[in-house]
C-alpha cells in the first residue's frame, strides 16, 4: 500500500508543479543576471537574492505600493533547483539576519504580503479604534487602502514554497526595517528550512550575504 500511496502523491505533485513554476518563472532574471546576484548554493539548490534599496526603482516595480517609503525592504529572491526531485522551502521561517559590529545579531521575520500591505498603507501605525458604526455581528468594512496595495504585492511576492525539479521560482520577500536601510549592508537572507520531498530529507540552511552590496 505504501508504494501505491507514494505513486499517487508523486502523480498529484507532477500536476501541481508546472503551475507553480510557470506562475513565478516568467519574470525571473535571465541566467547571466542571476549569476551576478549574491547567492548561496549547495545540494543542487541555488538561492539568489538582491535587496532593493532604490526607491525610484521600487516605485517602478510596485507603483503606489512602494514599500521603501514605509520602511519596508523588498528582497528579490530566485530559487533554482538543478536536481530531479522537488524541494520545499519553509517560507514562514525565512529571516533577514542583522549582524552588528558589536557581534550582536538580530533576526527580522519576513512579512506576508498582507502584513506588508498594511504597513505600507499605514506607515505610522494603524488608526485609533473608532466607535462601532454597525450592529454587533455584522462584518466590518475592510481596509480598502491596504487591500488595494495587497492586490499589487501578492502577485509579485514569493508565494510558492515548492521548487520543481530542474525548475526556478522567483518573487519578493518583505522585511520591516523601520526605515533604517543602513542595516542592509550588514545583513543576510537566512533560509533555515528546506527539504527534499517526498522523502522529507532536510537540507543544510542557506544564507545569502548582502555585506557591501
Question: Can you describe what each PLM-predicted range is?
Answer:
Residues 1-7:
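Positively charged n-region of N-terminal signal peptides that target proteins for export
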Residues 7-18:
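Bacterial N-terminal signal peptides
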Residues 19-23:
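Sec/Tat signal peptide C-region and signal peptidase I cleavage site
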Residues 24-213:
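Conserved functional micro-motifs across diverse proteins
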Amino acid at each position: 500500500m505504501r508504494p501505491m500511496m507514494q505513486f499517487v502523491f508523486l502523480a498529484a505533485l507532477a500536476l501541481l508543479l508546472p503551475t507553480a513554476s510557470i506562475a513565478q518563472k516568467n519574470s525571473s532574471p535571465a541566467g547571466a543576471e542571476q549569476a551576478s546576484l549574491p547567492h548561496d548554493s549547495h545540494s543542487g539548490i541555488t538561492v539568489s537574492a538582491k535587496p532593493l534599496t532604490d526607491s525610484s526603482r521600487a516605485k517602478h516595480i510596485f507603483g503606489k505600493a512602494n514599500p521603501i517609503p514605509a520602511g519596508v525592504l523588498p528582497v528579490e529572491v530566485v530559487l533554482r533547483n538543478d536536481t530531479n526531485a522537488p524541494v520545499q522551502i519553509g517560507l514562514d521561517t525565512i529571516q533577514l539576519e542583522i549582524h552588528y559590529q558589536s557581534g550582536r545579531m538580530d533576526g527580522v521575520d519576513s512579512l506576508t504580503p498582507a502584513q506588508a500591505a498594511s504597513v505600507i498603507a499605514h506607515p505610522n501605525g494603524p488608526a485609533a479604534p473608532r466607535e462601532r458604526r454597525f450592529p454587533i455581528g455584522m462584518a466590518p468594512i475592510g481596509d480598502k487602502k491596504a487591500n488595494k496595495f495587497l492586490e499589487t504585492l501578492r502577485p509579485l511576492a514569493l508565494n510558492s514554497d515548492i521548487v520543481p525539479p530542474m525548475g526556478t521560482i522567483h518573487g519578493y520577500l518583505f522585511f520591516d526595517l523601520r526605515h533604517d536601510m543602513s542595516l542592509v549592508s550588514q545583513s543576510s537572507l537566512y533560509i533555515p528550512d528546506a527539504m527534499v520531498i517526498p522523502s522529507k530529507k532536510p537540507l543544510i540552511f542557506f544564507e545569502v550575504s548582502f555585506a557591501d552590496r
